[in-house]
Amino acid sequence: MMRLWRRLTALVLALLLTLSVGAAGTTGFSDVPESHWAAQSIQRCAQYGLLQGVGGGKFGLGRTMTRAAYATALCRLMGWELVTPEKGSFTDNQDTAKWYYSAIETAYAHGALTGESRQCRPNDAITREEMAKMTVRALGLAVLSGTAADDCPFSDVSVAQGYVALAYRMGIIKGVSAYNFEPKKEATREQAAAVLLRTYDRLHAAIKVTET
């Protein structure tokens, strides 16, 4: 197991050499009180340009995060240049005029989204296990998911054990209790912000280590 985590660290550090995220000005939302548990994550995600509000000065607190919105945020986090092919890779991503078209195609090109199904379900709410899987795949760590599956601490995860285990061990995502993850539960926008911010912080903390 120690060899697995050494490989994980090495792969992440290698990835970081090309990672960059631009920062924007500080942003506040009228529906996010300063006392909210995710207030700092939301504010910093907006500041770094990872997430935007839903309009009218609101973040959309409590709303579910769509798969398209999360894929878009990952593209921004990873600094991927958007691609816009003439034909989409999924049956439900064929309209090039859709705001998420290029992000879906870019996430697919980088392996964050898979072609296992002919549909990407862009407007569906992303589940907690899908969020873990998409994030780990965006980091280029899918190769470790098979080995990591036996290290998953949550008894209610059966489909994406390796991805959840990796995301958990990296400190990117948390369980709802010591042994429960609620993998099929839909993630809210603030929960997605927390995962994105933790990913950002872990990556940039590792960058600082390699530079010293």
Regions found by a protein language model. Name each.
Residues 2-39, 52-101, 109-132, 137-162, ...:
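Feature responds to low-complexity, polar/acidic, surface-exposed segments characteristic
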Residues 168-170:
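GST-like fold's C-terminal all-alpha helical module
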Residues 165:
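Hydrophobic alpha-helical
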